[in-house]
Swiss-Prot record:
Name of the molecule in the record: Hemoglobin subunit alpha
Biological processes annotated in GO: hydrogen peroxide catabolic process
Residues with Phosphothreonine modification: 8, 108, 134, 137
Modified residues (Phosphoserine): 3, 35, 49, 102, 124, 138
Modification type Phosphotyrosine: residues: 24
Entry GO MF terms: haptoglobin binding; heme binding; iron ion binding; organic acid binding; oxygen binding; oxygen carrier activity; peroxidase activity
Tissue expr: Red blood cells.
PTM sites of type N6-succinyllysine: 7, 11, 16, 40
CDD domains to which the protein is assigned, alphabetical: Hb-alpha-like
Family: Belongs to the globin family.
Subunit structure: Heterotetramer of two alpha chains and two beta chains.
Species of origin: Vulpes vulpes
Any Pfam family hit: Globin
Keyword terms, alphabetized: Acetylation, Heme, Iron, Metal-binding, Oxygen transport, Phosphoprotein, Transport
Length: 141
């Protein structure tokens, strides 16, 4: 459960990210593919080389979904329902991959915003990414 302080930290951090969210999403995907090569199996049709246009484009989709989630922190299931359906029923992404991507998103944000990435912000973002992952995997059950 996200506390009021968590919500403030999440919104504040996302505001600071601003127009870089898509770039960070692509970088986090690159990190995921490099650190956890099994995640590449869901993208056989992509050029998975670091910085490829396809990885950047998908990273922007990830960032856009997270931006939607930030705007709907009080109703993540409603805001992410269609995306949950897509990942559960069509793409059939193994739920562990959301945790791996979440970790890489945290690393990416910490690298780009080290001064703002306090322990409290880290904890809030971790809780947020976990909440998003939980929603995205809720229809698997």
């Amino acid at each position: 459960v996200l506390s009021p302080a968590d919500k403030t930290n999440i919104k504040s951090t996302w505001d600071k990210i601003g127009g870089h969210a898509g770039d960070y999403g692509g970088e986090a995907l690159d990190r995921t593919f490099q650190s956890f090569p099994t995640t590449k199996t869901y993208f056989p049709h992509f050029d998975l080389s670091p910085g490829s246009a396809q990885v950047k484009a998908h990273g922007k989709k990830v960032a856009d979904a997270l931006t939607t989630a930030v705007a709907h922190l009080d109703d993540l299931p409603g805001a992410l329902s269609a995306l949950s359906d897509l990942h559960a029923y069509k793409l059939r992404v193994d739920p562990v991959n959301f945790k791996l991507l979440s970790h890489c998103l945290l690393v990416t944000l910490a690298c780009h915003h080290p001064n703002e990435f306090t322990p409290a912000v880290h904890a809030s973002l971790d809780k947020f990414f976990t909440a998003v992952s939980t929603v995205l995997t809720s229809k698997y059950r």
